[in-house]
Amino acid sequence: MLRSMWNFLKRHKKKCIFLGTVLGGVYILGKYGQKKIREIQEREAAEYIAQARRQYHFESNQRTCNMTVLSMLPTLREALMQQLNSESLTALLKNRPSNKLEIWEDLKIISFTRSIVAVYSTCMLVVLLRVQLNIIGGYIYLDNATVGKNGTTVLAPPDVQQQYLSSIQHLLGDGLTELVTVIKQAVQRILGSVSLKHSLSLLDLEQKLKEIRILVEQHRSPSWIDKDVSKSSLCQYMMPDEETPLAAQAYGLSPRDITTIKLLNETRDMLESPDFSTVLNTCLNRGFSRLLDNMAEFFRPTEQDLQHGNSINSLSSVSLPLAKIIPIVNGQIHSVCSDTPSHFVQDLLMMEQVKDFAANVYEAFSTPQQLEK
């Protein structure tokens, strides 16, 4: 039996070698294919897990953004009410002073200024925090993903995060003061000559707000005169000029300071981008629209108006003397800067443009390529 098999192999030696080679090749290719398929499956699973983890971190970061905005609104409201103290003027009016008309004129300017600044600063706060927290959120995600690997250093340690995020104080401090000055000048120019007895409809108010916005958004401080016109001039109220106090220290900068300066420069680049300008402008449009909606309930037609056949839906059907509009405008700050979720703030936080912009910022700063910069 063995001899006959051996003779068979000798007679068909080449065929057997060929067959063995083919079978061996098929076996090796099969094993190689299985290995590659397993590697691809493992890589896809790892990518899916990483993407799911990043998505979860992003969504968690957005909730943090929303809570941070709400937590900072009382500080913003207090700063505004301190700089534009209309309550002291209304208290004076209760005593019927001899200069009552002069006080009413001051109250007119301060009331409109306060509500308009409230809209601007709240919109800025929402979008600026979206930028800052998604930049730092991207760095934190990378830190969590790479910690302990190949001796990678932490990109954004807690002390850097704190130092970087403290830059929001510019908007609540010097930036807000400058914004108040610019808006007050614009209000004075548009409404200063309007008599307290002059009646205005909701449509008239909308037009006045548009005129004030044009003046405010065209204003550029000396340091912004040479800037590209495509860059929003409102950035000057959100971040200080190019040379930050840290960068001004030519010597003795710690690694923490250098990292913070890098983060601030990246933030400034983002604020000066066309996308940021578009998103902020969209927020402002929504904010002023909501402000008018809040005041619309005071412009409902009376029974007498209805009897005269005035159109209920017309924005110009009901007019009020400016003196009666002032208290309405004056009280809007409590709705605009409300730390409890209000329609005004919720509208801004839930806007799709804001969400998409936040996602783009996070995507840009949470990719591994960020480590190579």
Curated annotation (Swiss-Prot):
The entry assigns this protein to a family as follows: Belongs to the peroxin-3 family.
The record ties this protein, via PANTHER family, to:
PEROXISOMAL BIOGENESIS FACTOR 3
The Gene Ontology CC terms held by the record are: peroxisomal membrane; peroxisome
How this chain sits in the membrane, per its record, is: Multi-pass membrane protein
Subunit architecture: Interacts with PEX19.
What this protein is reported to do is described as: Involved in peroxisome biosynthesis and integrity. Assembles membrane vesicles before the matrix proteins are translocated. As a docking factor for PEX19, is necessary for the import of peroxisomal membrane proteins in the peroxisomes.
Ranges of the Cytoplasmic topological domain: 1-15, 141-373
Q: Peroxisomal face: residue ranges? A: 37-116
User: What is this protein's record name?
Assistant: Peroxisomal biogenesis factor 3
**What sections of the protein cross the membrane?**
16-36, 117-140
Provide the residue span(s) of the region labelled Targeting to peroxisomes: 1-45
Cite the entry's keywords alphabetically: Membrane, Peroxisome, Peroxisome biogenesis, Transmembrane, Transmembrane helix
**Interaction with PEX19: annotated span:** 120-136
Give the superkingdom in one word: Eukaryota
**Keyword Membrane recorded:** yes
Q: Which InterPro entries match?
A: Peroxin-3 (IPR006966)
The record lists the lineage as: Eukaryota, Metazoa, Chordata, Craniata, Vertebrata
Give one GO biological process term: peroxisome organization
Give the subcellular location: Peroxisome membrane
The entry lists its GO molecular-function terms as: protein-macromolecule adaptor activity
